[in-house]
C-alpha cells in the first residue's frame, strides 16, 4: 500500500472518530437529562403557538444533526481508507463503511421525530415514536453485525498494519452491542451506560493504535 495515502486516510478516520465521540457524549448528556422534558416543552410550544425553547431545539434537532454530519464525514474518510489499504483488506473496510452508512440512515430516521413533534399531536408522537424507534433499532443491529465482521477480519489480517488496534475495536464493538441489550432492561441502564463509555474509549484507543502503526510500502488497492 501507499504509506502516505494510508497515513493520511487513517489520520482523517481518527479525527472523524474523535469528533463523533465528543458529539455523541454531548448528545447522550442532553438525552439523559433534558431531552424528554425538552421534547414535551417543544410540543407545548407548538400547541400554544409560542416560540420553541432553545434546549428543545438543541437536544432534539441541533446536536443530532451535528452527530449525523460527523458520521457522514466518518463514512467519507472510510471511503478514502478503503482506497489506501492493501487489496486483501478492502472488503473489510468497505463493510465497516456500509455499517456506518446504516448508522447514518438510522440517525436520519431518528430525526424524523422532530417532524412528528411539529404536528403537535401527542398521539402521533407516541405512535410514530415507537415506529421510528423500532426502525432505528433494526438498522443499528445490522450495522453492529457488519461492524463486528469488519473488525474481526481486520484483526486477523496479515496485511493490515493496525491489527492490535483492530482487536480493541472488535472488543469495543462487542461491549457496545451488549450495552445496547442491557440498556433495554430495567434497572440495568447504569451498567449499560458505563459499558458505552468503555466502548467509546476502546474505539478511540483502537483507532489511535491504527493511526500510529508502522506501515510497509506495498501496492495500493485499486
PLM segments and residue spans:
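Membrane-interface extramembranous regions at the lipid-water interface
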Residues: 1-31, 35-51, 62-113, 135-179, ...
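Hydrophobic alpha-helical transmembrane segments
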Residues: 53-61, 127-135
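Membrane-interfacial hairpin junctions
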Residues: 40-46, 119-126
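Short hydrophobic membrane-inserting alpha-helices and related fusion/pore-forming segments
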Residues: 116-117, 123, 127-133, 179-195
Amino acid at each position: 500500500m501507499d504509506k502516505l495515502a494510508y497515513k493520511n486516510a487513517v489520520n482523517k478516520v481518527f479525527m472523524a472518530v474523535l469528533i463523533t465521540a465528543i458529539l455523541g457524549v454531548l448528545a447522550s448528556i442532553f438525552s439523559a437529562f433534558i431531552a424528554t422534558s425538552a421534547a414535551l416543552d417543544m410540543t407545548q410550544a407548538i400547541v400554544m403557538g409560542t416560540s420553541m425553547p432553545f434546549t428543545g431545539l438543541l437536544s432534539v434537532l441541533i446536536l443530532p444533526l451535528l452527530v449525523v454530519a460527523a458520521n457522514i464525514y466518518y463514512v467519507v474518510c472510510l471511503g478514502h481508507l478503503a482506497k489506501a489499504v492493501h487489496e486483501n483488506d478492502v472488503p473489510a473496510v468497505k463493510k465497516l463503511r456500509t455499517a456506518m452508512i446504516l448508522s447514518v440512515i438510522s440517525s436520519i430516521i431518528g430525526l424524523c421525530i422532530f417532524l412528528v413533534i411539529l404536528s403537535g399531536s401527542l398521539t402521533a408522537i407516541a405512535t410514530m415514536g415507537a415506529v421510528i424507534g423500532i426502525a432505528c433499532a433494526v438498522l443499528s443491529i445490522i450495522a453492529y453485525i457488519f461492524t463486528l465482521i469488519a473488525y474481526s477480519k481486520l484483526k486477523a489480517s496479515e496485511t493490515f498494519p493496525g491489527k492490535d488496534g483492530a482487536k480493541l475495536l472488535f472488543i469495543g464493538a462487542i461491549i457496545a452491542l451488549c450495552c445496547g441489550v442491557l440498556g433495554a432492561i430495567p434497572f440495568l441502564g447504569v451498567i449499560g451506560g458505563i459499558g458505552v463509555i468503555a466502548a467509546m474509549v476502546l474505539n478511540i484507543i483502537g483507532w489511535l493504535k491504527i493511526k500510529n502503526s508502522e506501515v510497509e510500502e506495498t501496492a495500493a488497492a485499486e
